[in-house]
Amino acid sequence: MTIKFLSESTINRIAAGEVIERPASVVKELVENAVDASSTKIDIILERAGKNLIIISDDGIGMTDKELEIAVERHTTSKFDESDFLNINTFGFRGEALPSIAAISKMLITSKKRDADKAFQIKLIGGNEKQVTISVHNEGTKIEIRDLFFATPARLKFLRADKTELAATVGVVKKIALAHPKISLSLTHDGKNLLKLKGQNKDAETNLKQRIIDVIGDDFIKNAAYIDFKTPDFSICGYTSSPTYNRASSEDQFLFINNRPVKDKLLQVALRVAYQDYLARDRYPICAIFLQINPQLVDVNVHPAKAEVRFHDPNYVRNLLIEAIKNALTNKSHVTSTTIASDALELFKNPLVNKQSPVSKVINVNSKSADYRPTTHSTLNTVPQNHVCQKLIDTLSHAKIEQEVENHIEHEQQTRKQYKLGAAKAQLHTTYIISQTEDSIVITDQHAAHERLGYEKIKDYLKTEELIKQRLLIPEIVELPNEKKADCLYDHREKLYKLGLTLEKFGEKSIIVTEIPNILGDVNVQKLIQDLADHLSDFGKNIALTELIEHVTETYACHYSIRAGRKLSADEMNALLRQMENTPLSGQCNHGRPTYIELKLKDIERLFGR
């Protein structure tokens, strides 16, 4: 076969294969064109998730008849100066979208230039039969795409179910909406309105906040830290969730470079690193983060879809993003997720019914230990009764609540006002500390809280020097499940020595431990070594030192911390609460779980119909 030139229609279909993968790709390209056209209102209509019909209408600057003819040709654009290719500020610039879409669909474009007398229309079928005619239309542009991929039926086979394709399109529209809070956007599918977002016209921070509430939700804003970070060439702003407010996937992570939504591995890794001290490895933060960068320091022309970028100095960008996120999280360091308390209260919000219900007499809880037993000496006949509340009362009626705090009332009131986590009042099930503030009660998980305190303490110590070792009076021999785990620990023995642990191989599956970190005190060495082996065996010999330190520090913190089941005195409980108030990120343990929940008095009163 001889070498020959491809036809224009074939070239366009090949280009479409790079740019247009699914209906969501069409919506992305056309809506971004509308944004570049200075639109303030964009409406999107879909049928069968865009497979049958896609209509994009805007109130942008519009096109003349001459511009319409040129716009559907390849490599035509009005969006940048050829002499300044490195300074691109628009979304589109390759001049490929319209001809690529036209090549695989039936396209109708109607447009009217601002302040023009006439509107014009152009019709294309498979990229051919270009006819420009006079039409009637408001200022702006309307593009109709019918029978997507009719000219490339093989591509149709790769499309997913309507529900999946629609979800992809909704995701695309949400990203564009977040990047442009001043633009009103609507999305309708098969006659049903899915999104209706009003343009915001206040200051930039307020606009962004309201658009995030509209797109991601009010709960996210309530549980997010605001990012505001600037250097001469970079600015980073947006919101990122508290560690306790997380997801099982990275689906709700929205990252933007110069308002362009991107899916960049470098930024995703930076996000993971910023949260590595606060989240379990299978949990993901939620965020909407916007990086504004000098256009000459980033290349957006890496791929036709423009979802990937290349930075002039990637490590610098990575470190800046990590620093910006960590600074924001530190400023919100003592806050736990507000939804935790709401979820707890929801358990009690069963429909209330009026029924005969006994009301117990007042119990004096000032004694060192008081039994709570409801009695029936009441003249009240109709009290709203919540089934879940009653279940809790029934459980507590058989338990002793240890009253550990017997300070003077005046001192207690002062403590409640002075400290965020209040004054310790009791310990439940030797696991949870109950404390009281001016307007709430706080329930603290003593193990999770102390684990975070220990983690921060050990981490700070490792920044300055090696951990002090304590020699075991009798060396501990630890037998592991298999030789692989024993070999893994032995392979890392030099690094572990710097982290306060001295060990040697003892047979095929055993390790002998002679020294442990002094900070761990009277620790269960058997359990410590087994947990370390479990952590490290998954990574083998190639684990980086920083990652090894992270794993070891997590394990140490867990074994250093107060265990559930340990009885604490009033002074010990208050000391723990005061330490939490003075420790960064004490609102969650190392795995992203909350260390405490706060129940507001007004919410508790609502449970009792007050």
UniProtKB/Swiss-Prot annotation:
GO terms for cellular component: mismatch repair complex. SUPFAM superfamilies: ATPase domain of HSP90 chaperone/DNA topoisomerase II/histidine kinase, DNA mismatch repair protein MutL, Ribosomal protein S5 domain 2-like. InterPro entries: DNA_mismatch_repair_CS, DNA_mismatch_repair_MutL, DNA_mismatch_S5_2-like, HATPase_C_sf, MutL/Mlh/PMS, MutL/Mlh/Pms-like, MutL_C, MutL_C_dimsub. The keyword Secreted does not apply. Gene3D superfamilies: 3.30.230.10, Histidine kinase-like ATPase, C-terminal domain, MutL, C-terminal domain, dimerisation subdomain, MutL, C-terminal domain, regulatory subdomain. GO terms for biological process: mismatch repair. GO terms for molecular function: ATP binding; ATP hydrolysis activity; ATP-dependent DNA damage sensor activity; mismatched DNA binding. The keyword DNA damage applies. Keywords: DNA damage, DNA repair. HAMAP family: DNA_mis_repair. This protein is involved in the repair of mismatches in DNA. It is required for dam-dependent methyl-directed DNA mismatch repair. May act as a 'molecular matchmaker', a protein that promotes the formation of a stable complex between two or more DNA-binding proteins in an ATP-dependent manner without itself being part of a final effector complex. PANTHER family: DNA MISMATCH REPAIR PROTEIN MLH, PMS, MUTL (PTHR10073), DNA MISMATCH REPAIR PROTEIN MLH1 (PTHR10073:SF12). Belongs to the DNA mismatch repair MutL/HexB family. This is DNA mismatch repair protein MutL. It comes from Rickettsia peacockii (strain Rustic).
